[in-house]
């Protein structure tokens, strides 16, 4: 199953989960409200997600005068990928990492931490930037924003189901089998958030493999990205980002939380070893 098809299936599963929860909480009217809520939140995510994440990490525009090598690499890769030149931002963070954001290629941003160019060679930096441009090319930022937003809607509806179970609400409260309806609300409140999280993680992991493959094609050097991933993974374990948020961890090229034991239980990224193996088999 291809990465794009798998992502489509998983997004459809998240949407179906939202509609199902809406039905469990409020019947046909609940299903409609759930759908509208998901739509409204997705529109907001589309327009404002990039501004929010850049502000979260105190990222500032990086001028070409301050980083001519970064700009030269990004310009060359953008031309190779047939993409507009993205804006480049700097994150004041010693842990080496990078991410891309923006609702479309015309509004794309690549953000790199101060620690990135301290430990990587120019070829390895090129591999990282190619990976981030691959996310832009594949519209992964839009996909991940939609997935995160839909997962947020699931959490809201699951909380509604929880309150419905506590206070005897739900569409089955007036039916003969009200106990079954109550049980359905309890099951929904417990399992729906877990299902949403697992689907979101599956989407994120699928898109990382695709970005590795596409980025290696842009740079014509999969080995440079493989070496960069090895260094970044080791640095992330030794020095995880202090201000990294679980809600945005999926944006980074390597998991910024990987040094924290609880974060490894449900990683937003596929195993580094498998990513490196795939790159070196290209």
From Swiss-Prot:
- Organism of provenance: Syntrophobacter fumaroxidans (strain DSM 10017 / MPOB)
Q: What is its main location?
A: membrane
- Give the protein name, as stated in the record: Protease HtpX homolog
Query: Keywords, A to Z?
Result: Cell inner membrane, Cell membrane, Hydrolase, Membrane, Metal-binding, Metalloprotease, Protease, Transmembrane, Transmembrane helix, Zinc
- Belongs to which family? Belongs to the peptidase M48B family.
Sites where the protein binds Zn(2+): 131, 135, 208
Q: Which GO terms describe its molecular function?
A: metalloendopeptidase activity; zinc ion binding
Tell me which NCBIfam families the record gives.
Answer: PRK03001.1
A GO BP entry is: proteolysis
EC number(s) on record? 3.4.24.-
Q: What CDD domains does UniProt report for this protein, alphabetically?
A: M48B_HtpX_like
Q: Where in the cell is it found?
A: Cell inner membrane
Segments traversing the membrane: 7-26, 30-49, 141-161, 183-203
Q: Cofactor comment in the record?
A: Binds 1 zinc ion per subunit.
Which top-rank group of organisms is this from?
Bacteria
State the needed cofactors, names only: Zn(2+)
